[in-house]
Amino acid sequence: MPMSPDPRPGRDGASTKPTVAFAHLGCEKNRVDTEHMLGLLSEAGYGVSSDESVANVVVVNTCSFIQEAREESVRTLVGLAEQGKELIIAGCLAQHFQEELLESLPEAKAIVGTGDYQHIVEVLERVEAGERVNRVSSTPTFVADERLPRHRTTGEAVAYLKVAEGCDYRCAFCIIPHLRGNQRSRPIESIVAEAHQLAAEGVKELILISQITTNYGLDLYGRPRLADLLQALGDVEIPWIRVHYAYPTGLTNEVISAYRDVPNVLPYLDLPLQHSHPDVLRAMNRPWQADVNERLLDQIRSQLPEAVLRTTLIVGFPGETQEQFEHLAGFLERQQFDHVGVFTFSPEQGTAAAELPNPVDADIALARKDRLMTLQQPISAAANARWVGRTVDALIEQHNPETGAMIGRCARFAPEVDGEVHIAPRADGLQAAPGTMIPVQITGSDIYDLRAEIVGAASMVASARSAL
Protein backbone atom coordinates (compact mmCIF):
# COMPACT_ATOMS: atom_id res chain seq x y z
CA MET A 1 0.00 0.00 0.00
CA PRO A 2 1.74 3.20 -1.14
CA MET A 3 1.44 5.21 2.03
CA SER A 4 4.18 7.07 3.86
CA PRO A 5 5.91 4.86 6.43
CA ASP A 6 6.01 7.82 8.80
CA PRO A 7 3.04 8.25 11.11
CA ARG A 8 0.43 10.50 9.54
CA PRO A 9 -1.11 12.83 12.15
CA GLY A 10 -4.79 13.49 12.55
CA ARG A 11 -6.46 16.61 11.21
CA ASP A 12 -5.61 18.67 14.28
CA GLY A 13 -1.97 18.52 13.14
CA ALA A 14 -0.66 16.41 16.02
CA SER A 15 -1.00 12.73 16.90
CA THR A 16 -2.59 12.91 20.34
CA LYS A 17 -3.62 9.26 20.06
CA PRO A 18 -1.59 6.15 19.23
CA THR A 19 -0.43 5.39 15.72
CA VAL A 20 -2.26 2.56 14.00
CA ALA A 21 -0.60 0.60 11.19
CA PHE A 22 -2.51 -0.74 8.19
CA ALA A 23 -1.95 -3.72 5.93
CA HIS A 24 -4.12 -3.87 2.82
CA LEU A 25 -4.80 -7.07 0.88
CA GLY A 26 -7.12 -7.89 -1.98
CA CYS A 27 -8.94 -5.99 -4.68
CA GLU A 28 -9.36 -2.30 -5.35
CA LYS A 29 -12.85 -2.37 -3.83
CA ASN A 30 -11.16 -3.47 -0.63
CA ARG A 31 -8.62 -0.68 -1.11
CA VAL A 32 -11.38 1.93 -1.04
CA ASP A 33 -12.63 0.48 2.26
CA THR A 34 -9.08 0.74 3.64
CA GLU A 35 -8.88 4.36 2.51
CA HIS A 36 -12.09 5.19 4.36
CA MET A 37 -10.79 3.57 7.55
CA LEU A 38 -7.58 5.58 7.21
CA GLY A 39 -9.59 8.76 6.78
CA LEU A 40 -11.84 8.04 9.75
CA LEU A 41 -8.96 7.26 12.11
CA SER A 42 -6.94 10.24 10.93
CA GLU A 43 -9.92 12.54 11.47
CA ALA A 44 -10.34 11.10 14.97
CA GLY A 45 -6.76 12.04 15.84
CA TYR A 46 -4.96 8.73 15.35
CA GLY A 47 -1.71 8.51 13.46
CA VAL A 48 -1.82 6.03 10.56
CA SER A 49 1.07 4.29 8.84
CA SER A 50 1.94 1.37 6.57
CA ASP A 51 5.01 0.64 8.75
CA GLU A 52 4.02 -1.96 11.34
CA SER A 53 7.17 -1.25 13.37
CA VAL A 54 5.80 2.12 14.54
CA ALA A 55 2.54 0.73 15.97
CA ASN A 56 1.32 -1.83 18.46
CA VAL A 57 -2.05 -2.17 16.73
CA VAL A 58 -2.32 -3.21 13.08
CA VAL A 59 -5.55 -3.15 11.07
CA VAL A 60 -5.38 -5.85 8.39
CA ASN A 61 -7.98 -5.49 5.65
CA THR A 62 -8.17 -9.03 4.35
CA CYS A 63 -9.28 -10.86 1.21
CA SER A 64 -11.19 -14.14 1.06
CA PHE A 65 -12.06 -14.34 -2.64
CA ILE A 66 -10.10 -17.52 -3.43
CA GLN A 67 -7.98 -19.98 -1.46
CA GLU A 68 -4.72 -18.30 -2.46
CA ALA A 69 -6.00 -14.94 -1.19
CA ARG A 70 -7.14 -16.47 2.10
CA GLU A 71 -3.76 -18.08 2.59
CA GLU A 72 -2.01 -14.75 1.97
CA SER A 73 -4.31 -13.06 4.48
CA VAL A 74 -3.67 -15.72 7.13
CA ARG A 75 0.10 -15.60 6.54
CA THR A 76 0.01 -11.84 7.04
CA LEU A 77 -2.01 -12.18 10.26
CA VAL A 78 0.20 -14.90 11.70
CA GLY A 79 3.37 -13.00 10.79
CA LEU A 80 2.14 -9.88 12.58
CA ALA A 81 0.97 -11.93 15.56
CA GLU A 82 4.44 -13.47 15.83
CA GLN A 83 5.81 -9.92 16.06
CA GLY A 84 3.58 -9.30 19.08
CA LYS A 85 1.15 -6.98 17.30
CA GLU A 86 -2.45 -6.58 18.38
CA LEU A 87 -4.66 -7.23 15.37
CA ILE A 88 -7.90 -5.74 14.12
CA ILE A 89 -9.02 -8.01 11.30
CA ALA A 90 -11.25 -6.32 8.74
CA GLY A 91 -12.61 -7.21 5.33
CA CYS A 92 -13.75 -10.37 3.62
CA LEU A 93 -11.86 -12.89 5.76
CA ALA A 94 -13.42 -11.35 8.88
CA GLN A 95 -16.87 -11.50 7.30
CA HIS A 96 -16.27 -15.10 6.19
CA PHE A 97 -14.90 -16.70 9.37
CA GLN A 98 -15.86 -14.25 12.15
CA GLU A 99 -15.55 -15.90 15.59
CA GLU A 100 -13.19 -18.58 14.26
CA LEU A 101 -10.54 -15.89 13.81
CA LEU A 102 -10.93 -14.62 17.36
CA GLU A 103 -10.71 -18.16 18.70
CA SER A 104 -7.64 -19.18 16.68
CA LEU A 105 -5.69 -15.91 17.01
CA PRO A 106 -5.38 -14.62 20.60
CA GLU A 107 -3.65 -11.55 19.17
CA ALA A 108 -6.86 -10.67 17.30
CA LYS A 109 -8.55 -8.00 19.39
CA ALA A 110 -11.38 -7.27 16.96
CA ILE A 111 -13.02 -8.39 13.74
CA VAL A 112 -14.76 -5.88 11.50
CA GLY A 113 -17.08 -6.99 8.69
CA THR A 114 -17.33 -5.69 5.15
CA GLY A 115 -20.41 -3.67 6.05
CA ASP A 116 -19.03 -2.32 9.32
CA TYR A 117 -15.71 -0.59 8.59
CA GLN A 118 -17.36 2.81 9.09
CA HIS A 119 -17.29 1.94 12.82
CA ILE A 120 -13.49 1.51 12.93
CA VAL A 121 -12.96 4.39 15.39
CA GLU A 122 -15.50 2.97 17.84
CA VAL A 123 -13.95 -0.49 17.45
CA LEU A 124 -10.46 0.81 18.19
CA GLU A 125 -11.67 2.76 21.23
CA ARG A 126 -13.28 -0.40 22.61
CA VAL A 127 -10.09 -2.37 21.97
CA GLU A 128 -8.10 0.31 23.83
CA ALA A 129 -10.53 -0.12 26.73
CA GLY A 130 -9.69 -3.82 26.90
CA GLU A 131 -12.59 -5.38 24.98
CA ARG A 132 -12.45 -8.04 22.29
CA VAL A 133 -14.85 -6.80 19.64
CA ASN A 134 -16.96 -8.62 17.06
CA ARG A 135 -18.37 -5.93 14.75
CA VAL A 136 -19.70 -8.04 11.89
CA SER A 137 -23.19 -7.58 10.50
CA SER A 138 -24.66 -10.87 9.27
CA THR A 139 -26.00 -9.10 6.18
CA PRO A 140 -23.90 -6.12 5.05
CA THR A 141 -26.03 -3.12 4.08
CA PHE A 142 -23.67 -0.14 4.34
CA VAL A 143 -22.35 1.73 1.32
CA ALA A 144 -19.98 4.67 1.72
CA ASP A 145 -20.53 7.99 0.01
CA GLU A 146 -18.65 11.25 -0.54
CA ARG A 147 -19.25 12.39 3.05
CA LEU A 148 -17.17 9.63 4.62
CA PRO A 149 -13.54 10.72 5.23
CA ARG A 150 -11.02 9.11 2.90
CA HIS A 151 -7.23 9.07 2.70
CA ARG A 152 -6.18 7.74 -0.71
CA THR A 153 -3.33 5.25 -0.95
CA THR A 154 -2.91 5.39 -4.73
CA GLY A 155 -0.69 7.87 -6.52
CA GLU A 156 -1.89 11.45 -6.63
CA ALA A 157 -3.26 11.17 -10.16
CA VAL A 158 -5.26 7.91 -9.88
CA ALA A 159 -8.34 7.17 -7.79
CA TYR A 160 -10.89 4.40 -7.56
CA LEU A 161 -14.53 5.35 -7.09
CA LYS A 162 -16.92 2.69 -5.82
CA VAL A 163 -20.31 3.27 -7.46
CA ALA A 164 -22.06 0.36 -5.73
CA GLU A 165 -21.43 -2.31 -3.14
CA GLY A 166 -22.46 -5.97 -3.16
CA CYS A 167 -23.92 -8.14 -5.91
CA ASP A 168 -27.33 -9.58 -6.80
CA TYR A 169 -25.96 -12.29 -9.09
CA ARG A 170 -25.13 -15.76 -7.82
CA CYS A 171 -22.39 -17.09 -10.06
CA ALA A 172 -21.68 -20.63 -8.90
CA PHE A 173 -17.97 -20.05 -8.27
CA CYS A 174 -18.20 -16.71 -6.45
CA ILE A 175 -18.34 -16.12 -2.69
CA ILE A 176 -18.61 -12.32 -2.92
CA PRO A 177 -22.43 -11.98 -2.51
CA HIS A 178 -22.13 -13.96 0.73
CA LEU A 179 -19.36 -11.65 1.95
CA ARG A 180 -20.62 -8.27 0.75
CA GLY A 181 -24.38 -8.63 0.48
CA ASN A 182 -26.76 -7.62 -2.28
CA GLN A 183 -26.13 -4.69 -4.58
CA ARG A 184 -26.48 -1.21 -3.06
CA SER A 185 -25.97 1.59 -5.58
CA ARG A 186 -25.07 5.15 -4.70
CA PRO A 187 -27.13 7.99 -6.19
CA ILE A 188 -25.70 9.58 -9.31
CA GLU A 189 -25.45 12.90 -7.48
CA SER A 190 -23.30 11.34 -4.75
CA ILE A 191 -20.89 9.76 -7.23
CA VAL A 192 -20.55 12.96 -9.24
CA ALA A 193 -19.94 14.95 -6.04
CA GLU A 194 -17.09 12.63 -5.06
CA ALA A 195 -15.68 12.78 -8.59
CA HIS A 196 -15.54 16.58 -8.32
CA GLN A 197 -13.75 16.24 -4.96
CA LEU A 198 -11.19 13.93 -6.53
CA ALA A 199 -10.71 16.25 -9.49
CA ALA A 200 -9.94 19.07 -7.05
CA GLU A 201 -7.26 16.82 -5.50
CA GLY A 202 -5.50 16.53 -8.86
CA VAL A 203 -6.84 13.17 -10.01
CA LYS A 204 -6.29 12.57 -13.73
CA GLU A 205 -7.69 9.04 -13.95
CA LEU A 206 -10.89 7.92 -12.24
CA ILE A 207 -11.68 4.20 -12.22
CA LEU A 208 -15.30 3.23 -11.56
CA ILE A 209 -15.63 -0.05 -9.68
CA SER A 210 -18.28 -2.30 -8.17
CA GLN A 211 -19.02 -6.01 -8.43
CA ILE A 212 -21.00 -5.58 -11.67
CA THR A 213 -20.69 -2.00 -12.81
CA THR A 214 -23.09 -2.40 -15.75
CA ASN A 215 -25.83 -3.19 -13.21
CA TYR A 216 -25.26 0.15 -11.50
CA GLY A 217 -28.54 1.73 -10.37
CA LEU A 218 -30.82 -1.27 -10.87
CA ASP A 219 -31.58 -1.58 -7.15
CA LEU A 220 -31.94 2.16 -6.62
CA TYR A 221 -33.75 3.32 -9.75
CA GLY A 222 -35.46 0.14 -10.94
CA ARG A 223 -33.27 -0.04 -14.04
CA PRO A 224 -29.53 0.09 -14.77
CA ARG A 225 -28.31 3.66 -15.19
CA LEU A 226 -24.62 3.35 -16.02
CA ALA A 227 -25.15 5.31 -19.24
CA ASP A 228 -26.73 8.19 -17.30
CA LEU A 229 -23.89 8.10 -14.78
CA LEU A 230 -21.25 8.27 -17.52
CA GLN A 231 -23.05 11.20 -19.13
CA ALA A 232 -23.10 13.02 -15.78
CA LEU A 233 -19.39 12.35 -15.23
CA GLY A 234 -18.65 13.94 -18.58
CA ASP A 235 -18.83 17.32 -16.85
CA VAL A 236 -16.13 16.43 -14.30
CA GLU A 237 -12.67 17.82 -15.06
CA ILE A 238 -10.89 14.47 -15.06
CA PRO A 239 -9.41 13.53 -18.45
CA TRP A 240 -9.66 9.75 -18.08
CA ILE A 241 -12.66 7.87 -16.70
CA ARG A 242 -12.26 4.11 -16.86
CA VAL A 243 -14.94 1.51 -16.12
CA HIS A 244 -14.05 -1.86 -14.58
CA TYR A 245 -16.18 -5.00 -14.14
CA ALA A 246 -18.66 -4.69 -17.01
CA TYR A 247 -20.95 -7.72 -17.14
CA PRO A 248 -21.53 -8.51 -20.82
CA THR A 249 -25.33 -8.62 -20.76
CA GLY A 250 -25.38 -5.10 -19.29
CA LEU A 251 -23.55 -3.50 -22.21
CA THR A 252 -26.63 -2.14 -23.94
CA ASN A 253 -26.63 0.15 -26.96
CA GLU A 254 -27.20 3.03 -24.55
CA VAL A 255 -24.10 2.16 -22.51
CA ILE A 256 -21.91 1.61 -25.57
CA SER A 257 -23.10 4.97 -26.93
CA ALA A 258 -22.03 6.64 -23.68
CA TYR A 259 -18.56 5.11 -24.06
CA ARG A 260 -18.45 6.57 -27.56
CA ASP A 261 -19.99 9.99 -26.92
CA VAL A 262 -18.66 11.11 -23.52
CA PRO A 263 -15.19 12.54 -24.27
CA ASN A 264 -13.49 11.63 -21.00
CA VAL A 265 -14.83 8.05 -20.84
CA LEU A 266 -12.14 5.76 -22.19
CA PRO A 267 -13.09 3.10 -24.77
CA TYR A 268 -11.62 0.48 -22.44
CA LEU A 269 -13.93 -2.41 -21.66
CA ASP A 270 -13.14 -4.77 -18.81
CA LEU A 271 -15.35 -7.81 -19.48
CA PRO A 272 -15.01 -10.74 -17.05
CA LEU A 273 -16.45 -13.34 -19.45
CA GLN A 274 -15.06 -16.38 -17.52
CA HIS A 275 -15.77 -18.89 -20.32
CA SER A 276 -17.25 -19.35 -23.78
CA HIS A 277 -18.81 -22.80 -23.79
CA PRO A 278 -22.59 -22.81 -23.14
CA ASP A 279 -22.49 -25.87 -20.88
CA VAL A 280 -19.71 -24.47 -18.70
CA LEU A 281 -21.45 -21.10 -18.48
CA ARG A 282 -24.66 -22.87 -17.51
CA ALA A 283 -22.82 -24.71 -14.75
CA MET A 284 -21.37 -21.36 -13.64
CA ASN A 285 -24.95 -20.01 -13.40
CA ARG A 286 -24.28 -17.58 -16.24
CA PRO A 287 -26.48 -19.35 -18.84
CA TRP A 288 -27.61 -16.27 -20.78
CA GLN A 289 -24.07 -15.11 -21.46
CA ALA A 290 -23.27 -17.74 -24.10
CA ASP A 291 -25.86 -16.21 -26.41
CA VAL A 292 -24.34 -12.73 -26.25
CA ASN A 293 -20.55 -13.14 -26.05
CA GLU A 294 -19.58 -13.07 -29.72
CA ARG A 295 -22.48 -10.87 -30.81
CA LEU A 296 -21.62 -8.33 -28.13
CA LEU A 297 -17.94 -8.23 -29.06
CA ASP A 298 -18.85 -7.67 -32.71
CA GLN A 299 -21.18 -4.85 -31.67
CA ILE A 300 -18.53 -3.21 -29.49
CA ARG A 301 -15.96 -3.28 -32.28
CA SER A 302 -18.49 -1.92 -34.75
CA GLN A 303 -19.52 1.02 -32.55
CA LEU A 304 -16.14 1.56 -30.85
CA PRO A 305 -13.41 0.86 -33.42
CA GLU A 306 -10.74 2.04 -30.94
CA ALA A 307 -12.03 -0.18 -28.14
CA VAL A 308 -9.47 -1.85 -25.88
CA LEU A 309 -10.84 -5.16 -24.62
CA ARG A 310 -9.76 -6.97 -21.47
CA THR A 311 -11.26 -10.19 -20.14
CA THR A 312 -10.70 -12.75 -17.41
CA LEU A 313 -11.26 -16.48 -17.85
CA ILE A 314 -11.56 -19.50 -15.55
CA VAL A 315 -10.19 -22.91 -16.55
CA GLY A 316 -10.60 -26.17 -14.69
CA PHE A 317 -14.19 -25.51 -13.64
CA PRO A 318 -15.76 -28.79 -12.40
CA GLY A 319 -16.75 -30.95 -15.35
CA GLU A 320 -14.85 -28.87 -17.93
CA THR A 321 -13.99 -31.34 -20.69
CA GLN A 322 -11.10 -31.10 -23.12
CA GLU A 323 -13.62 -30.31 -25.86
CA GLN A 324 -15.08 -27.45 -23.82
CA PHE A 325 -11.60 -26.11 -23.13
CA GLU A 326 -10.79 -26.23 -26.85
CA HIS A 327 -13.96 -24.19 -27.43
CA LEU A 328 -12.56 -21.58 -25.04
CA ALA A 329 -9.13 -21.62 -26.71
CA GLY A 330 -10.76 -21.13 -30.11
CA PHE A 331 -12.85 -18.27 -28.74
CA LEU A 332 -9.75 -16.58 -27.34
CA GLU A 333 -7.85 -16.95 -30.61
CA ARG A 334 -10.80 -15.73 -32.64
CA GLN A 335 -11.65 -12.68 -30.53
CA GLN A 336 -8.13 -11.23 -30.21
CA PHE A 337 -8.49 -9.49 -26.84
CA ASP A 338 -5.94 -6.83 -25.94
CA HIS A 339 -5.46 -8.08 -22.39
CA VAL A 340 -6.38 -11.41 -20.79
CA GLY A 341 -6.14 -12.81 -17.27
CA VAL A 342 -6.58 -16.54 -16.71
CA PHE A 343 -7.32 -18.22 -13.38
CA THR A 344 -7.62 -21.85 -12.38
CA PHE A 345 -10.85 -22.72 -10.59
CA SER A 346 -10.71 -22.43 -6.81
CA PRO A 347 -13.51 -24.21 -4.89
CA GLU A 348 -14.96 -21.85 -2.31
CA GLN A 349 -16.84 -23.20 0.68
CA GLY A 350 -20.39 -21.88 0.61
CA THR A 351 -20.64 -21.64 -3.18
CA ALA A 352 -22.61 -23.94 -5.46
CA ALA A 353 -19.53 -24.85 -7.48
CA ALA A 354 -17.77 -26.27 -4.43
CA GLU A 355 -20.34 -29.09 -4.39
CA LEU A 356 -20.17 -29.94 -8.10
CA PRO A 357 -18.94 -33.39 -9.19
CA ASN A 358 -16.15 -34.18 -11.65
CA PRO A 359 -13.38 -31.88 -10.41
CA VAL A 360 -10.61 -31.20 -12.91
CA ASP A 361 -7.17 -32.38 -11.85
CA ALA A 362 -5.05 -29.45 -10.65
CA ASP A 363 -2.21 -30.27 -13.06
CA ILE A 364 -4.62 -30.32 -16.00
CA ALA A 365 -6.15 -26.99 -14.94
CA LEU A 366 -2.71 -25.41 -14.65
CA ALA A 367 -1.68 -26.75 -18.06
CA ARG A 368 -4.85 -25.26 -19.56
CA LYS A 369 -4.08 -21.92 -17.97
CA ASP A 370 -0.53 -21.99 -19.33
CA ARG A 371 -1.77 -22.85 -22.80
CA LEU A 372 -4.22 -19.94 -22.87
CA MET A 373 -1.58 -17.50 -21.64
CA THR A 374 0.86 -18.78 -24.27
CA LEU A 375 -1.84 -18.46 -26.91
CA GLN A 376 -2.58 -14.88 -25.83
CA GLN A 377 1.00 -13.60 -25.85
CA PRO A 378 1.38 -13.08 -29.63
CA ILE A 379 -2.13 -11.60 -29.72
CA SER A 380 -1.22 -9.03 -27.06
CA ALA A 381 2.11 -8.35 -28.78
CA ALA A 382 0.34 -7.68 -32.09
CA ALA A 383 -2.21 -5.42 -30.39
CA ASN A 384 0.58 -3.37 -28.82
CA ALA A 385 2.51 -3.23 -32.09
CA ARG A 386 -0.44 -1.54 -33.79
CA TRP A 387 0.14 1.45 -31.51
CA VAL A 388 3.70 2.06 -32.72
CA GLY A 389 3.89 5.42 -34.47
CA ARG A 390 0.89 6.90 -32.70
CA THR A 391 1.04 10.02 -30.56
CA VAL A 392 -0.90 9.51 -27.32
CA ASP A 393 -1.22 11.03 -23.87
CA ALA A 394 0.75 9.28 -21.14
CA LEU A 395 0.12 9.62 -17.42
CA ILE A 396 3.51 9.69 -15.69
CA GLU A 397 3.65 7.57 -12.52
CA GLN A 398 7.32 7.18 -11.64
CA HIS A 399 10.91 7.68 -12.79
CA ASN A 400 13.59 5.06 -13.25
CA PRO A 401 16.42 6.41 -11.05
CA GLU A 402 19.08 4.45 -12.95
CA THR A 403 18.17 5.38 -16.53
CA GLY A 404 16.22 8.60 -16.06
CA ALA A 405 13.34 7.13 -18.06
CA MET A 406 9.79 8.04 -17.15
CA ILE A 407 7.30 5.24 -16.57
CA GLY A 408 3.62 5.75 -17.11
CA ARG A 409 0.55 4.47 -18.88
CA CYS A 410 -1.51 5.40 -21.89
CA ALA A 411 -5.27 4.93 -22.08
CA ARG A 412 -5.00 1.31 -23.24
CA PHE A 413 -3.40 0.24 -19.94
CA ALA A 414 -5.24 0.08 -16.61
CA PRO A 415 -3.09 0.30 -13.48
CA GLU A 416 -1.70 -2.89 -11.92
CA VAL A 417 -3.23 -5.38 -14.37
CA ASP A 418 -1.98 -4.15 -17.77
CA GLY A 419 1.30 -2.87 -19.17
CA GLU A 420 3.29 0.34 -18.94
CA VAL A 421 4.77 2.95 -21.25
CA HIS A 422 8.53 3.40 -20.84
CA ILE A 423 9.47 6.88 -22.04
CA ALA A 424 13.08 7.49 -23.05
CA PRO A 425 14.93 10.22 -21.12
CA ARG A 426 15.64 13.49 -22.90
CA ALA A 427 19.22 14.48 -23.57
CA ASP A 428 18.74 17.64 -21.47
CA GLY A 429 17.46 15.61 -18.51
CA LEU A 430 14.09 17.38 -18.35
CA GLN A 431 11.39 15.15 -16.88
CA ALA A 432 7.66 15.41 -16.30
CA ALA A 433 6.70 14.96 -12.67
CA PRO A 434 4.65 11.94 -11.55
CA GLY A 435 0.98 12.78 -11.80
CA THR A 436 1.32 14.83 -14.98
CA MET A 437 0.00 13.88 -18.39
CA ILE A 438 2.16 14.50 -21.47
CA PRO A 439 2.02 13.66 -25.19
CA VAL A 440 4.40 10.91 -26.31
CA GLN A 441 5.04 9.07 -29.54
CA ILE A 442 5.06 5.27 -29.35
CA THR A 443 8.35 4.00 -30.78
CA GLY A 444 8.33 0.30 -29.86
CA SER A 445 6.42 -2.49 -28.19
CA ASP A 446 6.60 -5.97 -26.72
CA ILE A 447 4.07 -8.43 -25.31
CA TYR A 448 3.04 -6.27 -22.38
CA ASP A 449 4.60 -2.80 -22.60
CA LEU A 450 5.18 0.10 -24.97
CA ARG A 451 8.23 2.31 -25.48
CA ALA A 452 7.92 5.98 -26.31
CA GLU A 453 9.66 9.31 -26.62
CA ILE A 454 8.53 12.78 -25.63
CA VAL A 455 6.78 14.92 -28.21
CA GLY A 456 7.71 18.61 -28.16
CA ALA A 457 9.85 20.49 -25.66
CA ALA A 458 7.18 23.09 -25.04
CA SER A 459 4.77 20.53 -23.63
CA MET A 460 7.49 19.15 -21.40
CA VAL A 461 8.35 22.56 -20.01
CA ALA A 462 4.69 23.28 -19.35
CA SER A 463 4.26 19.96 -17.57
CA ALA A 464 7.38 20.47 -15.47
CA ARG A 465 6.27 23.96 -14.45
CA SER A 466 2.77 22.79 -13.61
CA ALA A 467 4.24 20.36 -11.10
CA LEU A 468 6.20 23.05 -9.22
UniProtKB/Swiss-Prot annotation:
Cofactor: how and how many bound: Binds 2 [4Fe-4S] clusters. One cluster is coordinated with 3 cysteines and an exchangeable S-adenosyl-L-methionine.
Xref: NCBIfam families: 30S ribosomal protein S12 methylthiotransferase RimO, MiaB/RimO family radical SAM methylthiotransferase
Name by which UniProt lists this protein: Ribosomal protein uS12 methylthiotransferase RimO
Chief place of localization: cytoplasm
Domain MTTase N-terminal span(s) in chain numbering: 18-129
Listed EC numbers: 2.8.4.4
Molecular function (Gene Ontology), one example: metal ion binding
Subcellular location: Cytoplasm
Superkingdom of source: Bacteria
Protein purpose: Catalyzes the methylthiolation of an aspartic acid residue of ribosomal protein uS12.
HAMAP family for this protein: MTTase_RimO
Organism: Synechococcus sp. (strain WH7803)
Occurrences of domain TRAM (ranges): 385-456
Residues given in the record as [4Fe-4S] cluster 1 binding sites: C27, C63, C92
Taxonomy of the source species: Bacteria, Bacillati, Cyanobacteriota, Cyanophyceae, Synechococcales
Residues in Radical SAM core domain copies: 153-382
Stated family: Belongs to the methylthiotransferase family. RimO subfamily.
Cofactor dependence: [4Fe-4S] cluster
CDD domains for the chain: Radical_SAM
This protein's UniProt keywords: 4Fe-4S, Cytoplasm, Iron, Iron-sulfur, Metal-binding, S-adenosyl-L-methionine, Transferase
Catalytic activity: L-aspartate(89)-[ribosomal protein uS12]-hydrogen + (sulfur carrier)-SH + AH2 + 2 S-adenosyl-L-methionine = 3-methylsulfanyl-L-aspartate(89)-[ribosomal protein uS12]-hydrogen + (sulfur carrier)-H + 5'-deoxyadenosine + L-methionine + A + S-adenosyl-L-homocysteine + 2 H(+)
Pfam families (alphabetical): Radical_SAM, TRAM_2, UPF0004
Gene Ontology cellular component list: cytosol
